[in-house]
Amino acid sequence: MSRRRRAKKRIICPDSIYDSRLINMLVNRVMKDGKKSLAYKIVYQTMDQIAEKTEQDPIQILEEAVRNTKPLVEVKARRVGGSAYQVPLEVNPERGTVLALQWVLAAARNRSGRSAIAKLTNELIDASKKTGGAIKKRDDVHRMAEANKAFAKFRF
Protein backbone atom coordinates (compact mmCIF):
# COMPACT_ATOMS: atom_id res chain seq x y z
CA MET A 1 0.00 0.00 0.00
CA SER A 2 1.14 3.52 -0.70
CA ARG A 3 2.12 5.58 2.31
CA ARG A 4 1.48 8.84 0.53
CA ARG A 5 -1.65 10.91 0.72
CA ARG A 6 -4.14 10.68 -2.07
CA ALA A 7 -3.38 13.27 -4.74
CA LYS A 8 -5.85 16.14 -4.96
CA LYS A 9 -7.91 16.40 -8.11
CA ARG A 10 -6.74 19.21 -10.33
CA ILE A 11 -9.42 21.63 -11.46
CA ILE A 12 -9.36 21.86 -15.25
CA CYS A 13 -10.11 25.38 -16.41
CA PRO A 14 -12.09 25.88 -19.62
CA ASP A 15 -10.22 27.24 -22.63
CA SER A 16 -10.54 30.89 -23.62
CA ILE A 17 -12.05 30.58 -27.12
CA TYR A 18 -14.64 27.78 -26.86
CA ASP A 19 -15.07 27.97 -23.06
CA SER A 20 -14.86 24.18 -22.89
CA ARG A 21 -13.06 21.96 -20.38
CA LEU A 22 -12.98 19.16 -22.95
CA ILE A 23 -10.91 21.32 -25.32
CA ASN A 24 -8.39 21.98 -22.55
CA MET A 25 -8.19 18.27 -21.73
CA LEU A 26 -7.57 17.55 -25.42
CA VAL A 27 -4.88 20.27 -25.63
CA ASN A 28 -3.06 18.82 -22.63
CA ARG A 29 -2.99 15.40 -24.28
CA VAL A 30 -1.95 16.70 -27.71
CA MET A 31 0.92 18.61 -26.09
CA LYS A 32 4.39 17.07 -26.35
CA ASP A 33 7.51 18.26 -24.51
CA GLY A 34 5.64 21.17 -22.90
CA LYS A 35 4.84 22.90 -26.21
CA LYS A 36 1.38 24.05 -25.23
CA SER A 37 1.04 26.90 -27.73
CA LEU A 38 1.69 24.42 -30.57
CA ALA A 39 -0.92 22.06 -29.06
CA TYR A 40 -3.45 24.92 -28.90
CA LYS A 41 -2.72 25.76 -32.55
CA ILE A 42 -3.27 22.12 -33.61
CA VAL A 43 -6.53 21.78 -31.65
CA TYR A 44 -7.99 25.13 -32.75
CA GLN A 45 -7.15 24.47 -36.42
CA THR A 46 -8.71 21.02 -36.03
CA MET A 47 -11.89 22.65 -34.69
CA ASP A 48 -11.92 25.06 -37.65
CA GLN A 49 -11.56 22.17 -40.11
CA ILE A 50 -14.35 20.24 -38.39
CA ALA A 51 -16.62 23.29 -38.69
CA GLU A 52 -15.75 23.58 -42.41
CA LYS A 53 -16.21 19.90 -43.23
CA THR A 54 -19.36 19.16 -41.23
CA GLU A 55 -20.94 22.64 -41.12
CA GLN A 56 -21.86 21.93 -37.48
CA ASP A 57 -20.64 23.20 -34.13
CA PRO A 58 -17.18 21.61 -33.60
CA ILE A 59 -17.74 21.38 -29.83
CA GLN A 60 -20.81 19.20 -30.44
CA ILE A 61 -18.79 16.97 -32.79
CA LEU A 62 -16.03 16.65 -30.15
CA GLU A 63 -18.53 15.86 -27.38
CA GLU A 64 -20.30 13.32 -29.61
CA ALA A 65 -16.95 11.69 -30.48
CA VAL A 66 -16.00 11.41 -26.79
CA ARG A 67 -19.47 10.14 -25.85
CA ASN A 68 -19.30 7.44 -28.55
CA THR A 69 -15.76 6.40 -27.57
CA LYS A 70 -16.27 6.28 -23.77
CA PRO A 71 -15.96 2.72 -22.45
CA LEU A 72 -18.54 1.42 -19.98
CA VAL A 73 -16.30 -1.37 -18.65
CA GLU A 74 -12.60 -2.16 -18.72
CA VAL A 75 -10.43 -5.06 -17.57
CA LYS A 76 -7.72 -4.93 -14.92
CA ALA A 77 -5.24 -7.69 -14.13
CA ARG A 78 -5.58 -9.25 -10.68
CA ARG A 79 -3.31 -11.98 -9.35
CA VAL A 80 -5.10 -14.80 -7.58
CA GLY A 81 -3.21 -17.90 -6.54
CA GLY A 82 -0.30 -17.53 -8.93
CA SER A 83 -2.31 -16.73 -12.04
CA ALA A 84 -3.41 -13.34 -13.32
CA TYR A 85 -7.08 -12.87 -14.18
CA GLN A 86 -8.46 -10.09 -16.33
CA VAL A 87 -11.19 -8.74 -14.05
CA PRO A 88 -13.90 -6.58 -15.67
CA LEU A 89 -14.64 -3.32 -13.82
CA GLU A 90 -17.07 -0.49 -14.45
CA VAL A 91 -15.43 2.76 -15.53
CA ASN A 92 -16.31 5.96 -13.68
CA PRO A 93 -17.35 8.83 -16.01
CA GLU A 94 -14.22 10.92 -15.49
CA ARG A 95 -11.90 8.04 -16.35
CA GLY A 96 -14.13 7.19 -19.32
CA THR A 97 -13.61 10.68 -20.74
CA VAL A 98 -9.85 10.45 -20.23
CA LEU A 99 -9.68 7.03 -21.91
CA ALA A 100 -11.83 8.25 -24.81
CA LEU A 101 -9.50 11.21 -25.44
CA GLN A 102 -6.42 8.97 -25.22
CA TRP A 103 -7.88 6.48 -27.69
CA VAL A 104 -8.98 9.18 -30.15
CA LEU A 105 -5.49 10.70 -30.09
CA ALA A 106 -3.75 7.33 -30.43
CA ALA A 107 -5.98 6.41 -33.39
CA ALA A 108 -5.33 9.82 -34.98
CA ARG A 109 -1.56 9.41 -34.59
CA ASN A 110 -1.73 5.95 -36.19
CA ARG A 111 -3.55 7.28 -39.26
CA SER A 112 -1.60 7.73 -42.48
CA GLY A 113 -0.83 11.24 -43.68
CA ARG A 114 1.45 14.10 -42.74
CA SER A 115 -0.67 16.72 -41.03
CA ALA A 116 -1.58 16.14 -37.38
CA ILE A 117 -4.48 18.54 -37.86
CA ALA A 118 -5.99 16.56 -40.74
CA LYS A 119 -5.53 13.23 -38.92
CA LEU A 120 -7.15 14.51 -35.71
CA THR A 121 -9.98 16.14 -37.69
CA ASN A 122 -10.80 12.93 -39.55
CA GLU A 123 -10.57 10.79 -36.41
CA LEU A 124 -12.93 13.07 -34.45
CA ILE A 125 -15.44 13.15 -37.32
CA ASP A 126 -15.24 9.35 -37.67
CA ALA A 127 -15.66 8.84 -33.91
CA SER A 128 -18.74 11.08 -33.93
CA LYS A 129 -20.16 8.80 -36.67
CA LYS A 130 -19.28 5.67 -34.64
CA THR A 131 -16.48 4.52 -36.96
CA GLY A 132 -12.69 4.78 -36.82
CA GLY A 133 -9.83 3.42 -34.74
CA ALA A 134 -10.97 4.78 -31.38
CA ILE A 135 -14.38 3.10 -31.66
CA LYS A 136 -12.64 -0.16 -32.63
CA LYS A 137 -10.49 0.11 -29.49
CA ARG A 138 -13.58 0.67 -27.32
CA ASP A 139 -15.29 -2.35 -28.88
CA ASP A 140 -12.17 -4.47 -28.25
CA VAL A 141 -12.16 -3.45 -24.57
CA HIS A 142 -15.88 -4.23 -24.25
CA ARG A 143 -15.35 -7.60 -25.95
CA MET A 144 -12.46 -8.39 -23.58
CA ALA A 145 -14.64 -7.53 -20.56
CA GLU A 146 -17.47 -9.68 -21.91
CA ALA A 147 -15.11 -12.63 -22.43
CA ASN A 148 -13.82 -12.35 -18.84
CA LYS A 149 -17.21 -11.85 -17.20
CA ALA A 150 -16.69 -15.06 -15.22
CA PHE A 151 -13.89 -13.38 -13.24
CA ALA A 152 -16.09 -10.49 -12.09
CA LYS A 153 -16.25 -12.15 -8.65
CA PHE A 154 -12.57 -11.18 -8.12
CA ARG A 155 -13.43 -7.47 -8.04
CA PHE A 156 -11.07 -5.12 -6.22
Curated annotation (Swiss-Prot):
It holds the Pfam family Ribosomal_S7. Belongs to the universal ribosomal protein uS7 family. GO terms for cellular component: chloroplast; small ribosomal subunit. Coiled coil: none annotated. This is Small ribosomal subunit protein uS7c. GO terms for biological process: translation. One of the primary rRNA binding proteins, it binds directly to 16S rRNA where it nucleates assembly of the head domain of the 30S subunit. It is found in: Plastid, Chloroplast. Part of the 30S ribosomal subunit. Keywords: Chloroplast, Plastid, Ribonucleoprotein, Ribosomal protein, RNA-binding, rRNA-binding. It comes from Tupiella akineta. InterPro entries: Ribosomal_uS7, Ribosomal_uS7_bac/org-type, Ribosomal_uS7_CS, Ribosomal_uS7_dom, Ribosomal_uS7_dom_sf. GO terms for molecular function: rRNA binding; structural constituent of ribosome. Its main location: plastid.
